[in-house]
Swiss-Prot record:
GO cellular component, one term: virus tail, fiber
Gene3D superfamilies recorded: 2.60.40.3940, Phage P22 tailspike-like, N-terminal domain (2.170.14.10)
Entry keywords, A to Z: Viral tail fiber protein, Viral tail protein, Virion
Locations listed in the record: Virion
Lineage: Viruses, Duplodnaviria, Heunggongvirae, Uroviricota, Caudoviricetes
Protein's recorded name: Putative tail fiber protein gp36
C-alpha cells in the first residue's frame, strides 16, 4: 500500500455571511464588490464578479450579490462560488440596508502587484551576483562593495533599506550622492562627496542651499557660500531703520515695528493735523514743546493736545504767565511714538 500524504482540507467553497453583532445569517442581505479602498456601492467603483463553475469556467454576474436565508451568496436562487481576478473592497448590507461589514482591501497583495514586485526582486538578485562581502579583522562590521550596479539602475532601484557597517560606492561621474528625498520623488536633501575638489557638501534640493565642509587639519570649519554685494546690501536693508527725514517726518524699526514721528504746528493753528504716517495699531504717546527763537519774550505759552488718535491730532497754546503782551506766539513742536 502506497504512503498517503494528506494536504487538502475538505471545506465549503462558499462563505457563510453572518451579522456583525451576533451569530445569525445575514438573510436577504446584499454584497457589493469594488476597487480596493473605494466605496463598492457606487457603480463606477465596482469591478466584475464571476461565478466559477465546477469545470473551472467563469460566468460574469451583476451586482449586488444576494444572500439567501441561510447566509450563503446565491445566483438565481442557487448557492454559487463567486470570484474576482484582483484584490477588491467588499461591503455587506443586511435586509434593512444597514452596513454590517466593510473591507477596504481583501488581499494584502493583488496578483498584479505581486508579479511586479517579484520581477524587481529577481532583478536585484541578478545585480548582486557581482558583489563581494568580507569581514574587517576581528570586527563584526561587514564591508559591501558594489561594482556590478550601474548608476542608472542604482538611482531607480535603491529604495530598499541596506544594512552594512561600511558601504563602498564608486560613481562614474566623480561625485557620489546619497539622496535623502522621499521615495515618491519629492524634494529633500542630498549628501554628496565631491571627488575632484576633495570636499564634502550637503545640498538641500528643497531650499536650494548648500552646506560645505572643507577639509581642515584637526578642526572642521563650516562655511557658508560667498554672498555678493547685492545680497549683503539686501540683508542689511532688511534689518535697518527706515526713515523720512522731513520737517514733518518719521522713522520705523523693522524688527520691533516701533514708529517715531515728529513735526511742527504754526503758532495759532488749531486745526486737526494728520501724522506723516498713520500708526497701524496704536498711538502710545506724544511730547510737546514750544520752539522759541527769542529769549526776551515777555509772555510764556504752553502747548496742549486737544485730541489725538492713530491718524492725527489737534493742539493749541495756552497763556501761562502775564507780561506786556507785546510778543507773538511761537511755533509748536511735537513728537509721537507708537506702532
Amino acid at each position: 500500500m502506497s504512503k498517503i500524504i494528506p494536504n487538502i482540507v475538505v471545506s465549503m467553497p462558499t462563505q457563510l455571511f453572518t451579522l456583525r453583532r451576533k451569530f445569525q445569517a445575514c438573510s436577504n442581505g446584499k454584497i457589493y464588490i469594488g476597487k480596493s479602498n473605494t466605496d463598492p456601492t457606487i457603480p463606477t467603483n465596482q469591478i466584475q464578479v464571476y461565478i466559477e463553475n465546477e469545470d473551472g469556467s467563469t460566468v460574469p454576474v451583476a451586482q449586488p450579490i444576494m444572500i439567501n436565508h441561510a447566509g450563503f451568496p446565491v445566483y438565481n436562487g442557487q448557492i454559487a462560488k463567486f470570484v474576482t481576478v484582483e484584490s477588491h473592497s467588499m461591503a455587506v448590507y443586511d435586509s434593512d440596508g444597514a452596513q454590517q461589514f466593510y473591507f477596504a482591501d481583501i488581499l494584502k497583495y493583488g496578483p498584479n502587484r505581486f508579479k511586479e514586485q517579484a520581477a524587481q526582486y529577481i532583478a536585484y538578485i541578478e545585480k548582486l551576483k557581482g558583489t563581494t562581502t568580507q569581514t574587517t579583522g576581528d570586527s563584526t562590521t561587514d564591508v559591501m562593495s558594489q561594482k556590478a550596479c550601474t548608476d542608472t539602475f542604482a538611482e531607480k532601484n535603491s529604495k530598499e533599506p541596506l544594512k552594512a557597517g561600511r558601504l563602498n560606492l564608486e560613481s562614474s561621474n566623480g561625485d557620489t550622492i546619497f539622496n535623502l528625498g522621499g521615495t515618491d520623488g519629492s524634494a529633500g536633501s542630498e549628501f554628496a562627496y565631491v571627488k575632484n575638489s576633495k570636499r564634502t557638501q550637503i545640498y538641500d534640493t528643497a531650499t536650494q542651499t548648500t552646506l560645505l565642509f572643507p577639509q581642515k587639519n584637526g578642526t572642521l570649519a563650516v562655511e557658508e557660500d560667498t554672498y555678493t554685494k547685492t545680497e549683503v546690501d539686501a540683508k542689511i536693508n532688511s534689518v535697518k531703520w527706515t526713515t523720512n527725514k522731513l520737517e514733518n517726518g518719521w522713522m520705523k524699526d523693522p524688527n520691533t515695528g516701533i514708529i517715531i514721528q515728529w513735526g511742527s504746528v504754526y503758532k495759532t493753528d488749531r486745526s486737526r493735523k494728520l501724522f506723516p504716517m498713520a500708526f497701524p495699531n496704536t498711538l502710545a504717546g506724544m511730547g510737546l514743546a514750544n520752539f522759541n527763537y527769542d529769549d526776551t519774550l515777555s509772555e510764556m505759552y504752553a502747548p496742549n493736545i486737544m485730541s489725538a488718535d492713530k491718524v492725527g491730532f489737534k493742539m493749541r497754546q495756552s497763556l501761562v504767565t502775564d507780561g506786556y503782551k507785546d510778543s507773538p506766539l511761537t511755533d509748536m513742536r511735537w513728537i509721537a511714538i507708537g506702532w
